[in-house]
Amino acid sequence: MKREHKLEHEDMSSGSGKSGVCWEDDGGGMDELLAVVGYKVKSSDMAEVAQKLEQLEQAMMGNNFHDHDESTIAQHLSNDTVHYNPSDISNWLQTMLSNFDPQPNNPSVNSDDNDLNAIPGKAIYAADEFTSRKRVKRNESVTVTTESTTTRPIMVVETQEKGIRLVHSLMACAEAVEQNNLKMAEALVKQIGYLAVSQEGAMRKVATYFAEGLARRIYGVFPQHSVSDSLQIHFYETCPNLKFAHFTANQAILEAFQGKSSVHVIDFSINQGMQWPALMQALALRPGGPPAFRLTGIGPPASDNSDHLQQVGWRLAQFAQTIHVQFEYRGFVANSLADLDASMLELRSPETESVAVNSVFELHKLNARPGALEKVFSVIRQIRPEIVTVVEQEANHNGPAFLDRFTESLHYYSTLFDSLEGSSVEPQDKAMSEVYLGKQICNVVACEGTDRVERHETLNQWRNRFNSAGFSPVHLGSNAFKQASMLLALFAGGDGYKVEENDGCLMLGWHTRPLIATSAWKLAAANSVVVSH
């Protein structure tokens, strides 16, 4: 815990088989990089191969999508005119992975080409050198022909086939990483870069971020886990995920505060405070007038050492003043929620003030440190809130096996990138949202130990954790379901988004894949005894 800020205002706010087509070798020395994806090429020929791959990459106009400069990314996306059913990528990926057998073939660093797991493909390469005259046609497939005075073979590189090989290469690289076969993993991650340039839209971007995560893990260059507020704001504007999270949590809190004259929200994830103006507005419209509203906002230190929590408080206070809500605010800077202690929160008796605890995309980070989540559960029990609202990603990225985590995250983030492609938003917002998600991908793939904080778990896993910690579920009513559905109807490009009720919880999904889940909890009867402070 580093510091706190307090602000009060009386009236204020806020294949497995080898490919049948290969380049023959007349003398040993196969190159591992191409052999691993089904081709036999002599090391002495690699200069020619590299030249041809570079020519092919240029012909396909592939761009490595990972420039964090906003104007560059926005310009790139504004020129991307690919249109498709946005559900196709994730469904196609599901099919590809279901046909992929990740069982190890016992590769080792010293394996020869016969030990490598070949990835099936049907790209046919001309045996002779490229001539200077070529024709390239961009369509569902790319056809390149060479012209000369003699008849030459035709090189056909189908985008779909390269997409299949891309997915298989990603999986094979992850398997090599899990087996600590870094030589093969390095070869594969380079091949992924070549294959990604042939893809369009979401698949290229997803593959690029996963390739970055794999490369960082292989070479030991680990990313810093720091997501700027500006990236999150772009994500908020681009897709309904955070809007859904805030709306459903606020609805549960509003119902829990019904008839209360003084209320206190403890927000474990204050960020820019974007969640709370809507709740204060709803409280202001309550029959009989609004209650006194106290907000405690908890957040990490700012990367620029600015007093950002105080700034959030002032903005909320100004809003509260315009709607005539009595407002009090305190901000706590904490490196981890596990640093919290109930005595810091200036809790008042339940007879005079009702408390709600809110956490949006925060609790999963505690899984990185043994005992941290249990410590926070203990603090919540001491707070004795009327309700605890929790929003988390609906994914399991916290398993012990790297390959399982990689596969699950590839499915999950492919769906998220699909949803971004399907939205009608400003290119800059979409580009920055992709960077926001890309940072998560790199953390899931590249990091381990306490550095791996994106340890998402499913709703069922969180149910087990809360039940074991002495909490019982609070069902989110049909009213919240209907209003959340209306929210999506108002969101541009929201046709692919779905709201589902799951045993009293609400899930937001893209087509058939759930993305996030909102749940609400209260102390079980046995844990409702009064604790003096």
UniProtKB/Swiss-Prot annotation:
Biased composition (Basic and acidic residues): 1-12
Family per similarity comment: Belongs to the GRAS family. DELLA subfamily.
Annotated stretches, region: PFYRE: 355-443
Native species: Medicago truncatula (Barrel medic)
UniProt subcellular location: Nucleus
Motif (DELLA motif): 31-35
Region (Leucine repeat II (LRII)): 311-343
Name this polypeptide is given: DELLA protein 2
Region of interest: SAW: 446-522
InterPro entries in alphabetical order: DELLA_N_sf, TF_DELLA_N, TF_GRAS
Example of a GO biological process term: gibberellic acid mediated signaling pathway
